[in-house]
Curated annotation (Swiss-Prot):
Coiled coil: none annotated. This is Dihydroxy-acid dehydratase. SUPFAM superfamilies: IlvD/EDD N-terminal domain-like (SSF143975), LeuD/IlvD-like (SSF52016). Mg(2+) binds at residues 81, 123-124, 489. It comes from the Bacteria. Pathway: Amino-acid biosynthesis; L-isoleucine biosynthesis; L-isoleucine from 2-oxobutanoate: step 3/4; Amino-acid biosynthesis; L-valine biosynthesis; L-valine from pyruvate: step 3/4. Binds 1 [2Fe-2S] cluster per subunit. This cluster acts as a Lewis acid cofactor. Its EC number is 4.2.1.9. The gene is ilvD. It comes from Pseudomonas entomophila (strain L48). It is an enzyme of class 4 (lyase).
Length: 613
């Protein structure tokens, strides 16, 4: 039987000093025989997705103690990408993922914790904690803060979210009063932004990986039903500890659950629901921590066979996360995939013996369990609040229409090709990614003239100054993990293209990345990035670029000889932006850039540079 890790600091005469300190935290004699379970919280008043988490760690802690464990809570940082966007703050967003992963590792290993409950929610927090959990490989369960309710206003016939406020603000024809109304209405409650953006995508993917409870990704932050997820997580983590430490059952460990097939399941879910392209970055990073050989080629392979079964904002205005929940949540999408013969259903989860068993219990089209049906009727109250579990509104009916509803069957898919695609070509030899769910059919094949910008800032200025015309392909480079550094999100450029009426008339290619709120022909993660000698750094104004999503290709239409000559010239100049960029790159960011790999590797640290240290 494996010993509790915590015995290192709780047992033996020589640990009298450590026990004295443990006692000072409130532990008693009997507690030194129990598992010490770390609660990694991410409460902060900076982020609406985390503003309600302050007391939830202690809610879980009390449940852990009732179930026979010892709970010890700590906090990680959390960056709000929406607030950090559009200025140098965005340089810190992706690097914060590594900081969060390291912080969880530091706290758990320094104090010899036996297991972890990860309370996450927004963009880089769930991925960072996931990386740490797979790195540590001790019992873990994820429970997130939940999605925000969609905004409501009389000025729009559909629900609102953050992107609506950004787009309307850039529309010169919109009155100040309309902009103010959208601003006040777009983000009405606590929780992660209400569309299928990065935060919600990742919280849904933890369900598919088998590391979170059903409903984790879709139950509203404001709804009273979400409290049960936190309480159940507290009980479940103690049970996982008993199975591993008491019964030598290694099948409950995160690397046993989140194996190669589980990563395929998660990616198939992502493709089926048209999730954020950032999820590709984060799944690749998590796979490396799990020592799972899952890469961009696997994602490309899956993207060709998985249909799109769900459309949510920003890909369609009609649906938000509250509508996904009403349609049965993630296990209903997984159920559709399973019935289509696509899903691996023999895998265990933290809550069920197999994914097949979980689908039978939680897919609303497969169960008559009234409690499950009631759970998925949880809906929005439409009352602005920053308080968790503050309302108990329910829909009168479920959306179980798999032909025309929010979630579809394979036979009635929105499209037979999924919502994400990987493109390859001479401009991105190691690949780039596009959220096809947000691309209009008329521009799936697009040839245009390159319009070069050496930074997101200059691109924003150029778009707002009407320098970008219909038929252009906006190239934003030196914004990758090294070149930024930090791989900024490009939500402002894409939002401004929409506001200028160019959403279906232009494309955008970058070695940076996109917010989950991005739609349109927006292609990111070009690898290798410009700062690493990628061909995106060789494109010149006016060059023809051909994008062919059906054939998964993207090519700069110049000869190989010309590209080779340009590379020789660029090697002499150095792979740096042609313009001076007035951004402050601190020591912390320089340290991140030094080890960062390109996006096709998940923008993780280059471990080869650390070998031998």
């Amino acid at each position: 039987m494996p010993d509790y890790r915590s015995k290192t600091s709780t047992q033996g005469r020589n640990m009298a000093g450590a026990r004295a300190l443990w006692r000072a935290t409130g532990m008693k004699d009997e507690d030194f025989k129990k598992p010490i379970i770390a609660i990694a919280n991410s409460f902060t008043q900076f982020v609406p997705g985390h503003v309600h988490l302050k007391d939830l760690g202690q809610l879980v802690a009390r449940e852990i103690e009732r179930a026979g464990g010892v709970a010890k809570e700590f906090n990680t940082i959390a960056v709000d990408d929406g607030i950090a966007m559009g200025h140098d703050g965005m340089l810190y967003s992706l690097p914060s993922r590594e900081i969060i992963a390291d912080a969880v590792e530091y706290m758990v290993n320094a104090h010899c914790a036996d297991a972890i409950v990860c309370i996450s929610n927004c963009d880089k927090i769930t991925p960072g904690m996931l990386m740490a959990a797979l790195r540590l490989n001790i019992p873990v369960i994820f429970v997130s803060g939940g999605p925000m309710e969609a905004g409501k206003t009389k000025l729009a016939s559909h629900g609102l979210d953050l992107v609506d406020a950004m787009v309307i603000a850039a529309d010169s024809s919109a009155s100040d009063e309309k902009v103010a109304e959208y601003e006040r209405s777009a983000c009405p409650t606590c929780g992660s932004c209400s569309g299928m953006f990065t935060a919600n995508s990742m919280n849904c993917l933890t369900e598919a990986l088998g590391l979170a409870l059903p409903g984790n990704g879709s139950t509203l932050a404001t709804h009273s039903d979400r409290e049960q997820l936190f309480l159940t997580a507290g009980r479940t983590i103690v049970e996982l500890c008993k199975r591993y430490y008491g019964e030598n059952d290694a099948s409950v460990l995160p690397r046993s659950i989140a194996n190669f097939k589980a990563f395929e399941n998660a990616m198939m879910l992502d493709i089926a629901m048209g999730g954020s392209t950032n999820t590709i970055l984060h799944l690749l990073a998590a796979a490396q921590e799990a020592e799972v050989d899952f890469d961009l080629r696997d994602i490309d392979r899956l993207s060709r066979k998985v249909p799109q079964l769900c459309k949510v904002a920003p890909n369609i205005q009609k649906y938000h996360m509250e509508d996904v929940h009403r349609a049965g949540g993630i296990f209903s999408i997984l159920g559709s995939l399973a019935r289509g013969g696509l899903l691996h259903t023999d895998l265990p989860t933290v809550h069920s013996r197999s994914m097949e068993e979980a689908i039978a219990k939680w897919d609303i089209t497969q169960t008559d369990d009234e409690a499950v049906h009631t759970f998925f009727k949880a809906g929005p109250a439409g009352i602005p609040t920053q308080t968790a579990f503050s309302q108990s509104t329910r829909w009168e009916t479920l959306d179980d229409d798999r032909a025309e509803g929010c979630i579809r069957s394979v036979e009635h898919a929105y499209s037979q090709e999924g919502g994400l695609a990987v493109l390859y070509g001479n401009i991105a030899q190691d690949g780039c990614v596009v959220k096809t769910a947000g691309v209009d059919d008329s521009i799936l094949v697009f040839e245009g003239n390159a319009k070069i910008f050496e930074s997101q800032d200059s691109a924003v200025r150029g778009i707002l100054a009407d320098e970008v015309k219909a038929g252009d392909i906006v190239i934003i480079r030196y914004e990758g993990p090294k070149g930024g550094p930090g791989m900024q999100e490009m939500l402002y450029p894409t939002s401004y293209l929409k506001s200028k009426g160019l959403g279906k008339a232009c494309a955008l290619l970058t070695d940076g990345r996109f917010s989950g709120g991005t739609s349109g022909l927006s292609i990111g993660h070009a690898s290798p990035e410009a700062a690493a000698g990628g061909a995106i750094g060789l494109v010149r104004d006016g060059d023809k670029v051909l994008i062919d999503i059906p054939n998964r290709s993207i090519n700069l239409l110049v000869s190989d000889e010309e590209l080779a000559a340009r590379r020789v010239e660029q090697d002499k100049k150095g792979w740096k932006p042609a313009e001076v960029r007035p951004r402050k790159v601190t020591t912390a960011l320089k340290a991140y850039a030094l080890l960062a790999t390109s996006a096709d590797k998940g923008a993780v640290r280059n471990k080869a540079m650390l070998d031998g240290l």
